[in-house]
Amino acid sequence: AHSMGGCVGSLLIEEYPEYFDAAILNAPMMGINLLGIPKPIVKAFVNAAIGFNKGASFAFDHQEFIPNEKVEIKKSSTKSKARYLYVSDLRNENIYYQTNGATFSWVNAALEATGNIFKPKQLKKINIPILIVQAEKDNLVSPKAQDKFARRTENTKIIFMPQVEHDTFNSKEDFLQAYYFELF
């Protein structure tokens, strides 16, 4: 599972451990990159926005999907220009791929979900091997939260991927070879 799917996957493993033999979590969202802003301040701001009926508004510097917008690759979550352009073309052609920024309600739900992952009662239920693929240059999720998860579970291993962004599977060829070798 990747990113937000890693959050959902972690919660499922905690709630229904009997359905899983092992898991690979790729740059899992076990915490959000809050850009150095303390979580209580973010929560207060998000709750205020929701209180003023702005839950459906885009949070902070996020925005809706803009078709055919050219984003500089250095601002993306990958460094492979070919893979970036391929995914960009897919997103432009298919309305179901046209997701983009987070709303205040999404941030609120994400903070709640990532907090639930770390409840001690839930963590104790995890009894399967878990492999976390951690991207050094992840600008969307918190690698520190992934480290915390690994420390608090008995059978979690982290594969640290240096110089790699959040979209690990869209990285350059040299990284992907090491990535797939490690996983398979």
Model-flagged regions — what are they?
Residues 1-5, 9:
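Gly/Ala-rich beta-loop-alpha elbow adjacent to hydrolase catalytic centers
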Residues 9-98:
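Alpha/beta-hydrolase-fold enzymes
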Residues 24, 131-133, 159:
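Hydrophobic/aromatic beta-strand patches that form the interior of the parallel beta-sheet core
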Residues 102-122:
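Active-site nucleophile elbow and catalytic-triad environment of alpha/beta-hydrolase enzymes
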Residues 126, 132-134, 138:
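Short beta-strand/loop motif that positions the catalytic acidic residue
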Residues 128, 141-151:
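Short alpha-helix in the alpha/beta-hydrolase fold that links the catalytic acid
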Residues 147, 151-167:
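Catalytic histidine neighborhood in serine/cysteine hydrolases
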Residues 162-184:
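Catalytic active-site module of serine/aspartate enzymes centered on a nucleophile-bearing elbow/loop
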